Amino acid sequence: MKPADPSPVASAGERIAPSRLQRLANTAAGIGVVLALACGALAVGASSAHAAAAIVIVNLNEPGVGFNDPTPATPVGGNPGTTLGQQRLNAFQRAADIWGATLTSSVPIRIGASFEPLSCNATSAVLGSAGANEIWANFTNAPRTDTWYPSALASKLAGTDQATPGQPHILARFNSRLGLFPDCLPGAGFYLGLDRNFGDGIDLVTVLLHEFAHGLGFQTFTDDETGEEIDNLPSIWDYYLLDNRLNRTWVELTPAQRAASAVTWCGLSWNGPIVTANVPRVLAPSSNLTVSGAAAGGAAGDYQVGDASFGPPLSNTPVRGQLMPVVDQANGTGLACTPLNSTNALAVRGNVALVDRGTCDFVVKAANVQAAGAIGMVVADNQPGDVSGLSGNDPSIAIPSVRVTQTDGARLKEALQRRSRTRSGVVASLGLNTTRLAGTDAQGRILLYTPSIYSPGSTVSHYTTEAKPNQLMEPSINDDLTHEVTPPRDLTYPLLQDIGW
């Protein structure tokens, strides 16, 4: 990446204002993270008066818009604001207070913030963006020389403000039109309450906690697509990004090797000691599909699975039964998008149903096989790729469901070629792997998000989506997140501690 300004601006260090800031985008697959460029001028804002680190929200909006929008609003969820603008500012301040009470710094942290119209349409929208405004190397008291640090962290470590005079440490902008207009994701606006009772809305405080973390340093400044460093200097992150196949950190790898590890599923671990020590306190055992039985053949063994957001979670008491496929299409696949016919219902009754992804929602498939008497459901992906979960919500689903890759699904189907109407001789057991925590490598280190298909802005600078419980710094904002950033619920703050906070 071409640096914006490679020249020294202070006697003790070098500064760059990078254009790589994080943007949350609402897509068909959920909330993802892409790249953005943000800049702005300063104005007076509010501050956290009693925090271990004072965080100042600097209002960048002009009169009458954004934080200054006078549209009347009814207080909601502990947010006492009576205008839309004041409620927005209160939500920002709540997120700032949570981080301020967690961090320590003698230098107030300034977040330049605004609400403004961002890209959106009726089905998708950019939610907002936030990230470090500047990065610094070789400043006073820098723990590592020739290493990039985000502005807020560099200031904390130096004990004096490193930011360019008149500039914030973090920039944040969010979509002022979201959910308020028919051409901007109608019905899915920001929930401005402070109590997480967001219903069908998007909890702004949770999104802000995530985005502020990026600005505080939860990101690498090395180009994760090309592996190239800025001015041939590593980010502080790169000392803790471990290619677990090569057992080497990013600072020890070539650009090509870094780029390769960024698209190797489960191939990149966080090697920081504070995060690793807290992993057992935070993460739960991983979900697992074990296949056995006289007819299993080459399909026997353990399978990595994606969990469902509906139905009961897998537990230490496995759900175990014959694996039986649903076949309701002329090509031999089984979608289970309509009530099962008598042949398929007989096959899955009292057994674990194997169905294919496609055409209808996962909860529809689960409801149909459950109605036919299945005790569990395995969904085989219909596209190449990594393990993913099953989205959806239906409180009537009472059977466990998991998802396997297209490759693993093909292995299972091959083993099921010879079967009777009610038995396959292939036994599926849906349970937990108590020897492996969800989202970790073989050494118990948490994994970073490295999908095999590069995802701009999401790849590397997030935790894996395999973690359980869901973590704040996954690339998607999940409904079960709390406003906690510390153990025993969350591993965001331990990572910031690893890099110097």
What are these regions (language model features)?
Residues 1-24:
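N-terminal secretory signal peptides that target proteins for export/translocation
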Residues 28-43:
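Bacterial N-terminal signal peptides
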Residues 44-51:
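Sec/Tat signal peptide C-region and signal peptidase I cleavage site
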